[in-house]
Amino acid sequence: MRESSQIRETTETKIKLSLQLDDGKNVSVRTGVGFFDHMLTLFARHGRFGLQVEAEGDVFVDAHHTVEDVGIVLGNCLKEALHSKEGINRYGSAYVPMDESLGFVAIDISGRSYIVFQGELTNPKLGDFDTELTEEFFRAVAHAANITLHARILYGSNTHHKIEALFKAFGRALSEAVERNANITGVNSTKGML
């Protein structure tokens, strides 16, 4: 099974995270940031991934360090779980509607970290979650996993719905990208490596 478990401990956070790419039965998320827990759970469920997260952070300051560090550890686990990247689709994309909002995510498991994030988040805070941390999370994942990630909110009026559409689209796009494909021999690249 393609899986990884890692712990990251700094003076600001302690993150324990396990990711299973091929078994989505076990999802348990506790970061101390309720809205973020909800989004990570949606990502795992819609990607059909197993995900267990236990995070302690300096949320008395704000949620920035916790959200960013969870993104870093998730990216590290994704990179480790994929190993050589042989036989996977490599690319994945998904449009996901959430009522009046539409989110889009495209992913390339390229070995090159890059992110494009586009979207207007008009409500600056959802519970204890600063909505600008949405981009910070995706940036942390992309850089740690060495993937190219495009995330875009096409339209919508409800900030919760916009972010939810993105996290669901992220799960679905990543699921497609990491899916094993019997028609692919080696890695899906003319270079012979990713």
Swiss-Prot record:
Signal peptide feature range: none
A Pfam family matched in the record:
IGPD
- Ligase as a keyword of this entry, yes or no, is no
* Cell compartments where the protein resides: Cytoplasm
Molecular-function GO terms, alphabetical: imidazoleglycerol-phosphate dehydratase activity
Query: Which reaction equations make up its catalytic activity?
Result: D-erythro-1-(imidazol-4-yl)glycerol 3-phosphate = 3-(imidazol-4-yl)-2-oxopropyl phosphate + H2O
ATP-binding as UniProt keyword: no
- Could you tell me the Gene Ontology terms of the biological process aspect for this record? L-histidine biosynthetic process
State the UniProt keywords alphabetically: Amino-acid biosynthesis, Cytoplasm, Histidine biosynthesis, Lyase
> Which family, according to UniProt?
Belongs to the imidazoleglycerol-phosphate dehydratase family.
Record's protein name? Imidazoleglycerol-phosphate dehydratase
Q: Which organism is it from?
A: Bacillus cereus (strain ATCC 10987 / NRS 248)
Name the gene behind this protein.
hisB
